[in-house]
């Protein structure tokens, strides 16, 4: 009996499946995909198929016979390509038709993406669609073409080929096939995400020509696109013509995202009156409003919406609360974040690990690592589930505090709680050990990772070689570097940079330069690393020279390092040049850099440049911090420009930045010096100063801020100059009773007044007390005391 070659091939494929040792239905598929899964006899049978000699006609018959087993068809086609056989358009059409009929969308998408990428396929994608239409049964033709066309649209979109995806819609119409509106919506939505608004609007206007009927989701996508483009009026008109709850929700979100949250609130109120919004839809849009107000820095408005949501029966929305806390933390306004959290906890908010991690990270970013640890323990004691992200913040805080051994103990605690450490957790601890110079312990952790079946990634190795380099272990660095090149993960530009910076930090500048010279590929990033490296080595002038030669944008961290190094060494003009270059390359300097530069300008009384930089910060959306506001206010007070100082004081309060004792003291000191008793000004100005000083003191007291030594000294000085020595002494005693230690300035302010008024005994008592407190020999004061006493007596008796 004779058998056709096609029958023989098919029987061999099925025979392989029947002989499988497992009962899994798809064993043959996995075996064909991975020949290593086959036994020797099975592999021999597959090799005997002679796929390379199979004709296109035979291939077609074989594929048709697998229509009841799409996985087998897919595997067979892959085997063909592995044997160098290029399936023609008919073979692909058959496979696509089979996958479509079975509804295997993910596999279909994969095949089509692979097909689109293959530029040597020998046919166009539209040829494929036409053949599929010809092959399909008449009653299934429309169904198959719609599914395939929709899948093609998605495949092109996934590759960012929007023109080709749009072309599929028109070509399908030519074949009397109208693509499902869902595929068109998918295309339009991705156009929006990629900013291709013009292309989207053109397609939207041609929907009727394509035979497509837009649904509410189509209109919502167009509304979203128009909002992103800033065409709010056009979006509103489109929405009025095609009202839907989904469309309104999209429009409201667009208003909130574009800084028009107040308009969004007005629209929501109107829709509530029309009974158009209620339930979950209302809750969703109110959440959008909260996020919108947060983005616009209208934090109290955001908080009021959350309270409103609770009062109308929605309860506390954890995601809305999260948005408020997140914004406070991003602005480094930790007191407000904690205050809001406490209020919400009082109302029954269930805190999750995301909120905890935001709070802890904010502490660390503000260099309050000790406080972060205390808060971590507090949250842990509240039985809040803390994930590995929260633990990692604690690891990082302990490492920065030099308590890496405690971090390791915390790792054991995390394991005991059933939380499996990940690569990031180990990397943080490795970094902590390196910071303390305990490189052996860091290497032990690498071994532990590998022993637990965890592969250190490139970031882990970068942290390790950086730590070794910073501790001067040049040979070990180069050994690991060579191993990475040989075994992986391959070193990248970051690896090279951290080695250069690390060696410079260890004062091995020559070795760093030699390492750079040895690199086969030198990138701009590595050259920029020398700017940071020279700064680490205390060579800021050399770093600046290297910086000037680099005529391209650098990492922000490079600018920051150079800027602060120049400031520390007093090269303020060069530091200002760094800021200017950042601005030229549109690199945002950040609040700390601008604040530092403003402080430097203020110390030089160059308040004009300070104000220009201050205004630039605000224009860029960078809210100056308390330090920056205070030093600007102090400078204006020192230059007797009180109106500008007062304007800044009010501005900081409006932005939600609470003045501290230093800010209040700066203003109080200036106002008190306007008092006519100080003999600095006329009586009218003096009365104004007296009134404003009283206002500051009242506000100071209402804020619940305790006086510090400087503030007490200012008040003591005022009483002394008004000859109210008894009240000055009372203030001095009150300062001590409050637990504060008077400093040298506070003592000398009162002592000099006692001498001036002839209260020699009281002055000598304070001098003796001061001598004992600062452990200064009394002989050092004796001459000064006698001289002061003699002058006082002569003054007293008119000599």
From Swiss-Prot:
Localization terms from the record: Mitochondrion
SS bond list: none
Top-level taxonomic group: Eukaryota
Annotated PPR repeat ranges: 145-179, 180-214, 215-250, 251-278, 282-316, 317-351, 352-386, 387-421, 422-456, 457-491, 492-522, 523-553, 555-589, 590-624, 625-659, 660-695, 708-742, 743-777
Keywords on record: Mitochondrion, Repeat, Transit peptide
InterPro entries reported in the protein's UniProt record: Pentatricopeptide_rpt, TPR-like_helical_dom_sf
Location of the transit peptide in the chain: 1-27
Chief subcellular location: mitochondrion
Keyword Acetylation among record annotations: no
Native species: Arabidopsis thaliana (Mouse-ear cress)
GO CC annotations on file: mitochondrion
Protein name: Pentatricopeptide repeat-containing protein At2g26790, mitochondrial
Homology family: Belongs to the PPR family. P subfamily.
